[in-house]
Design a protein with these regions (language model features):
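Active-site mouth of glycoside hydrolases
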Residues: 1-263, 274-287, 291-313
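Short acidic/histidine-rich active-site segments
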Residues: 267-269
Length: 313
């Protein structure tokens, strides 16, 4: 619901934060989103680097260079991003950390702490209170920020639709999944202590096995998680690729969201490989997109965001 009315959307993942050209073309990006009737943008409000990061990284990529140094210029640019989104009438989902090493992510948090950053080492991010404290500091800094351009606190800004704790969280062991459940509960509750205006999403990748599905349900059933979110890339280990498999995937997630968790369903990322040109497995790629959206909204899905939208490339 938005303003007392049902809110459903087609949106896009966009990257106005990481890179010189991407930052320079922020206004163009939101103009294009508006023209293409894409009403929600998912943006990564993250970027972690080493204290000896290059000047270019500091100027165009990072939110932090080491655990002690916050890059104010990046926060100023995030102010600009939200202003341009507001002008374009686009709502924003801000993702606050990354499971992967792109722009730092969980591996960089672990390196800051002198911990193993690969494979099973990721469990430490959810287990180590020092990692919790570093992430909470970033969350508090973003959610409580007052825009230099609008003088609106982010926690009060209606341009923001939701906070997403992580991009594509994955964990391989039962102990790690239990630790992540506690972490999601802690961080979602932390945001809700000073922001009662916005939705909070967990940011899990999804599931392909029964054990992962049970954990997915447990995380999304937490009181302070407001909607179910899953990513959809059938070619990446989520089953054999066919239109029927696409329908089965969407029907399963819709049933889980509506009948078990009883929360709205958002497909936070979806896409189909482009290495076969305009066709994918014998069908036009446009047909795959159309069928995904048709089935998702037929199932009363709340929204879906394509990966990735680059109108000027």
């Amino acid at each position: 619901m938005l303003g007392g009315q049902p809110f459903r959307f087609v949106g896009a993942n966009v990257n106005p934060m990481h890179g010189e050209e991407d930052r320079r073309r922020t206004e163009d990006l939101f103009t294009a989103l508006r023209q293409d009737n894409l009403s929600v943008a998912r943006i990564w409000a993250l970027g972690e680097g080493q204290p000896d990061a290059t000047e270019w990284q500091i100027k165009y990529v990072l939110f932090q260079a080491g655990p002690e140094r916050v890059i104010e210029e990046t926060l100023l640019h995030l102010d600009r991003v939200l202003l341009e989104a507001r002008r374009a009438g686009v709502r924003v989902i801000l993702t606050l950390s990354n499971n992967w090493a792109d722009y730092g992510g969980v591996p960089m948090y672990l390196r800051w702490l002198g911990l193993p950053a690969d494979g099973m080492g990721k469990e430490a991010f959810y287990l180590d209170e020092r990692a919790h404290a570093l992430f909470r500091a970033h969350v508090g800094r973003i959610v409580n920020r007052v825009s230099s351009l609008t003088n609106i606190r982010y926690s009060d800004d209606p341009t923001i639709l939701a906070w997403e704790l992580m991009n594509e969280s994955t964990i391989d062991t039962p102990a790690g999944r239990q630790a992540r459940l506690y972490w999601v509960r802690e961080m979602a509750r932390y945001i809700k202590t000073f922001d009662h205006n916005h939705l909070v999403a967990a940011g899990l990748w999804g599931y392909s096995m029964r054990s992962e599905r049970a954990d997915f349900i447990a995380v999304h059933s937490l009181r302070d998680i407001d909607y179910v979110d899953s990513h959809l890339y059938l070619q990446n280990g989520q089953g054999n690729v066919s239109l029927q498999r696409l329908y089965d995937f969407l029907d399963d997630r819709a049933y889980l969201a509506e009948q078990i968790v009883r929360k709205p369903l958002v497909i936070g990322e979806f896409g189909f490989r482009t290495d076969q040109g305009p066709r994918y497995l014998g069908l036009p790629r446009s047909r795959w997109f159309a069928e995904l959206l048709r089935r998702h909204f037929q199932n009363q899905g709340a929204g879906a965001l394509v990966w990735i939208y680059e109108p000027y490339h």
